[in-house]
Amino acid sequence: MCTIFAKKTTSGILVGRNLDWLQKGGTLHYMPSQRLYGSPTKALFMIEQMGVDKPYEGVNETGLFIGCAVTPIDLNPPPPDDNRDKALKMDELGAIRFVLERATTTQEAVKIMDTISLNNSYLDYFLRIHFLIADSDGNIAFYQSGDQTIFKSLENGPGEVITNFPKSANIGNCRRYNTVSEHFDEVKGMETALKLLEQVKQDDYTIWSAVFNLNSLEVWLCIETDYKITHKFSIQDELKKGYSSLDFGTLKLSDPEIKQQFAAHSYELASSEWVPCLGL
């Protein structure tokens, strides 16, 4: 229930992402480079719901992006386990952070992914995860464990998109896929990319919409289909402050427009108690 697209524009390589899911909430993490196993990791930004070790998406300091969506297993059953000889075994979501900490390009990311035996943690829900990987040079990969990786370049064609079908499947009946494909030419920058995400939102299920510029390392974020309020961040500026995390509840309350709404509301005294008339 997700949509991820990538498009080359004059302002940079843009990735747009709707996280459509059953569970609300989320947390942003800014992770500076650290020494790990004797080597420095790449600094990165991630968004997650299940813990800092299991992000749904992220981008590192070099402009490498990895995001995931699910596919039904009846459309693309997992292959027989041929990864038993791989030394690294990892959760699919955990692999996103692991790879972002180490890779610079799409090709490097795929090479690292190929060394990992990925645990299909969503099989109990009849789902598999597939990934869109993109770098700041416009190199794209569609990756799903056990399947052949598809490489593309944003230099050729209007853009690339994944939803909830394998890239090799006939997806003519997916409204979100078709809508994005038909409106790629409208994506000129961050604002128009966000408008395209708004077109393919799913009212009860879109938890966040994010646009990443893989060259300037900017991110724009809207929460729970509230496209009137856009949270804008410079990943580089935030990383300079050191490690930080910010949950969606705190993020929404910190927005100046939200603060102004509280300041504009009146309060009435009733039954010897202060009762806020917020209309929320």
Describe these PLM feature segments.
Residues 117-125:
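Short arginine-rich
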Residues 1-101, 126-280:
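C-terminal, well-structured catalytic/ligand-binding subdomain of enzymes
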Residues 100-102, 108-118:
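Short N-terminal edge-element motif at the start of the domain
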